[in-house]
Amino acid sequence: MKQLLLVVVSILAFSTVHAQTDEFLKNYDEFKQQAQTNYEDFRQKVNKEYADWMRQAWEWHRKIEPKPRPKDDMLPPVIYNKEQQSEPKPVIYDEVVPAPEPQPQPKPIAPIRENKGDFQVATFQFFGTKGQVRLPKNFSFRINGKDEEAYATAWENLSSNQYDNLIRDCLVLRMERQLCDWAYLMMLGAMSEAVCGKGTNEATILQAYVFCQSGYKIRLGFTNNKDLRLLVKSEHVIYDLPGFRMNDGLYYLLQPINDGGLHICDISFPEEKPLSLWIAQEQKFANQTSKERQLISENKQVAVKSQVNENLLQFYDTYPTSMVGENIVSRWAMYANTPLSEKVREQLYPQLKAALKEAKSVEESADWLLHWVQTAFVYEYDDKVWEHDRAFFAEETLYYPYCDCEDRSILYSRLVRDLLGLEVILVFYPGHLATAVSFKTPVNGDYINLNGKHFTICDPTYIGAPIGMTMPDMDNKTAKIILLGK
């Protein structure tokens, strides 16, 4: 009898709990639905107000000429003379540039819910990579006119939920392809031109709209001919791009204009954030493998075959030179902190590790890597090759036939951090860039004491020099230290 009573009580208790659970889930679903509705209402309200301002808030702003990228008179490489050895000495420095702290990417002001309505699929290409987005059924986006009213109406049309799938698909591509902010902006440009036509006002406002809805700071302007132009705000100072001074800072112009300025709608969007030029992770473009290149050190200790993704190089061609704040030497950290792609690591690193197995210590491994970078690559000035200064990402040095001191130092710093797990800093002298490595055991040679750590100079452009040797004529010059991430 007691057992029967226990069973009945248990059943009743289970039924009660089950009913409570159902009620909770029902209430939660209703709450979730209401919250989503509130989000959508908020976003539509914001876009409606934004469009209303677009009908009236356009003012003339004069263009600010581009800041030219720094031109450093780089010193030529020097051949090491064993007979000119000197006592180890500290490197004098007067500034330490801190390591970067990349922030999370911007996000929409409200979740973008998938629209279950009818749609059509559009495909496009960006950096050799296929993209696919959903557009409204029978998509035909046109701006009826070239004035403030027409542009505001176009913004209102885009902000209907018919275009929510497009925004979602673009954000999914950003996530799946691990696109940095600049790559995402370029992708949106390719998408917009594919569906609206190259150089059209429709393509410009579509790119601006999706970038804005993704959480980024944008401004729209138009020329004297009423052609739309997109302006973007950056965390960093960008060289070689003209800009416009808005209420919250400088915005950069991506498309050329013949006029001395633009009529700009300087209206902010809630929670908007500037784009960043940090590349925190590999950009996963479709792979287009380059021709094989052999890279052999002069003493034959290290010999490898190298191939890179040409689609990635195509993206790097678009990447603008920039600096953090107003510190011109910070620009090299942007390149040195960018990781090598997985495919390059899978091909190159096993070969390098196999060669370094013969080394008797970590210090000797670093020395062999140094000699490889010193002698396997051909030195040439950027002015002669590119007609302007151009720093390389590590992959570019592995691909292009020539490189200079900054490219070698960027590559060497990447290899030492990845293969040997050691901390590396960049050392900038006037006209020259080198590296310094923090070994776990004391190493003889020129050094930098920094934050309680001992860094030994390793110069990839001092040809034939072992670790610990500073290139001649650098000794008495004040250096700047650039801290790097892992």
Which residue stretches match the model-derived regions?
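Sec-dependent N-terminal signal peptides
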Residues: L4-A13
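Sec/Tat signal peptide C-region and signal peptidase I cleavage site
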Residues: S15-A19
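Long, contiguous, compositionally biased segments that the model treats as domain-scale units
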Residues: D29-K32, Q36-V210, S214
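Sec/Tat-exported extracytoplasmic proteins
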Residues: A35, Y39, R43-V46, Y50, ...
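Secondary-structure boundary elements
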Residues: R134-K137, G145-M187, A333-Y399, T461
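Extended, non-transmembrane interaction/recognition domains
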Residues: S192, K198, E202, L206-K357
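Active-site neighborhood of thiol-dependent amide/isopeptide-bond enzymes
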Residues: A194-Q207, E380-K440
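Hydrophobic/aromatic-rich core segments of domains that either
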Residues: I218-N247, K357-K360, D407-K486
